[in-house]
């Protein structure tokens, strides 16, 4: 929101816990990851703030207040003569609030001159918070992402029903759903039954991962290949999933790569 006579305000829900997000204000390497390589923030009252832009412009200010995992306030403006918003002349407050699905980040930029167009500041802060969200959400998932994808693939290959249920319980959130061109199931029970049917129909084919999984704003993408007993690749594709804060999938959607002479779904049964 940008009121010509008031502060600039931006809100964004990030798929990460407040403690994860707050590290991007207190750790120098993490701060530079979302604010730019030459950016510096000393996260103590009176600490220095410096943000360098690719154009050569530099923003500067001082930290005013810090509440761990919840709030940080700093002054803001631009270095150099003749700046409409001189360094340290305005104030930015950022509040982190835990919400379902992660953290709501509320940014308020106040003290801008009355004649200063707010649109550029609004666009700039939206861009910055998007970079923060990308980095923070990826870090939230990083410790468990490979394991969750591994459990998903292992569940499709597991012949023992009890063990299959255990694997799905680790990688699928309660009520999680799965969709692909021939499948629409809701919950671990339906998915386990579907996997059992696929195993019977495919005669020993196995699901293998292709490449490293990727995360973006709480979404996950990972490739797969269906491999026959003789190691022939029968099909390939990509799954896209939404993960909760523990890395379990709320939903998974599978996309198949084109294959010549692929049978229509009705011919597969």
Where are these regions (language model features)?
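A solvent-exposed, acidic/Ser-Thr-rich amphipathic alpha-helical stretch
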Residues: 18, 37-52, 59-61, 67, ...
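Short beta-strand segments that buttress and anchor functional surface loops
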Residues: 49-54, 74-79, 221-229
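Amphipathic alpha-helical segments
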Residues: 15-34, 169
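Hydrophobic pocket/interface hotspot
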Residues: 21, 31, 49, 63, ...
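Short acidic-aromatic low-complexity motifs
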Residues: 15-19, 142-171
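A beta-strand edge to alpha-helix "cap/lid" segment located at domain peripheries
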Residues: 82-134, 198-269
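Glycine-centered tight beta-turn/hairpin loop motif at sheet-sheet or coil-to-beta transitions
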Residues: 5, 54-56, 230-232
């Amino acid at each position: 929101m940008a009121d010509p006579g008031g502060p600039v305000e931006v809100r964004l829900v990030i798929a990460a816990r407040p403690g994860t997000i707050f590290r991007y204000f207190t750790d120098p390497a993490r701060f530079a990851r979302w604010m730019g390589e030459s950016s510096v923030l000393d996260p103590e009252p009176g600490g220095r703030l410096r943000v360098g832009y690719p154009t050569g412009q530099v923003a500067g200010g001082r930290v005013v207040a810090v509440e761990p995992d919840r709030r940080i306030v700093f002054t803001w403006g631009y270095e150099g003569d003749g700046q409409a918003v001189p360094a340290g002349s305005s104030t930015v407050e950022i509040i982190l609030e835990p919400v379902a699905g992660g953290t709501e980040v509320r940014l308020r930029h106040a003290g801008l001159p009355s004649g200063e167009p707010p649109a550029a500041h609004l666009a700039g802060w939206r861009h910055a918070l998007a970079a923060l969200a990308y980095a923070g959400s990826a870090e939230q998932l990083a410790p468990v992402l490979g394991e969750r994808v591994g459990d998903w693939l292992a569940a499709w290959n597991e012949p023992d029903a009890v063990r299959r249920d255990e694997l799905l319980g680790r990688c699928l959130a309660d009520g999680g759903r799965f969709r692909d061109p021939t499948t629409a199931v809701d919950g671990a029970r339906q998915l386990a039954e579907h996997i059992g049917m696929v195993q019977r129909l495919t005669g020993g084919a196995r699901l293998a991962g292709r490449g490293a999984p990727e995360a973006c704003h709480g979404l996950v993408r990972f490739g797969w290949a269906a491999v026959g007993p003789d190691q022939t690749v029968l099909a390939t594709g990509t799954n896209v999933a939404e993960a909760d804060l523990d890395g379990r999938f709320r939903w998974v959607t599978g996309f198949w790569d084109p294959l010549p002479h692929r049978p229509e779904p009705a011919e597969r049964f």
